């Protein structure tokens, strides 16, 4: 069998440029009072469960995991797709009827480390696979930290829609997310993009991580700061991944 490594970062780039377009088209024109991000499955599930009237305000953009999986299945129809990351909630997302044919398995970093340990595999001694050819921008690479999605969308709006006023809110932890949604429901937060992340600190603070937040956030910042270009091309909003 052949292993094809893919990252979800390029799909994050597509997502942030599409979200910026959606914000400019729907929120800035008053068609929607606010727009909720959808890349964190726990956040979107909570919003749908406790605030069902807001379902139409949740972005319809595919999550980076699903978008990547669909590209893999298109390029390699018989491939088995395994998503590896710090998020335990991705396991439930992969079980959805609309997703289960795209993502075959989900394992966390912690589980992967356990597999390495059980099989006496030392990653540093293994042959490196070639990186995916489509590199991500700093915007896509910053998705994993709280405020990263909102920040990427905000920067895209300022670059490509300079005449559109930008109002961004973000919350981390489900308790804070619920507070923000309660305020939005009451009309106290409006005309904005709202990013929600279930895990404090964002994805890098996920339940399945195998490293401390201080270490991972520092590494991510270095990774983002060293990335070029900083923003995805506006042309990406025309890509169809559905």
Question: Where on the chain are the PLM-derived regions?
Answer:
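Iron-sulfur-associated redox domains of electron-transfer enzymes in respiratory
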Residues: 1, 5-242
């Amino acid at each position: 069998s052949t292993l094809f490594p893919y990252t979800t970062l390029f799909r994050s780039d597509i997502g942030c440029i599409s979200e910026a377009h959606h914000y400019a088209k729907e929120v800035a024109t008053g068609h929607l009072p606010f727009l909720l991000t959808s890349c964190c499955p726990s956040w979107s599930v909570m919003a749908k469960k406790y605030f069902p009237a807001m379902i139409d305000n949740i972005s319809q953009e595919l999550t980076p995991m699903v978008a990547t999986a669909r590209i893999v299945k298109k390029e390699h129809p018989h491939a088995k797709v395994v998503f590896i990351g710090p998020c335990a909630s991705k396991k439930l997302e992969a079980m959805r009827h609309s997703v289960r044919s795209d993502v075959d398995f989900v394992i966390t970093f912690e589980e992967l480390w356990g597999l390495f340990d059980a099989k006496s595999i030392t990653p540093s001694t293994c042959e490196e696979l070639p990186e995916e050819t489509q590199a991500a921008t700093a915007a896509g690479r910053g998705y994993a930290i709280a405020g990263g999605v909102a920040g990427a969308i905000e920067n895209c709006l300022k670059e490509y829609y300079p005449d559109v006023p930008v109002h961004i809110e973000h919350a981390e932890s489900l308790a804070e997310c619920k507070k923000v949604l309660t305020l939005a429901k009451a009309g106290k937060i409006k005309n904005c993009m709202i990013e929600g992340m279930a895990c404090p600190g964002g994805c890098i603070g996920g339940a399945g991580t195998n490293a401390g937040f201080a270490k991972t956030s520092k590494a991510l910042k270095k990774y983002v700061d060293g990335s070029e270009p900083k923003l995805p091309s506006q042309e990406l909003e025309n890509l169809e991944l559905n």
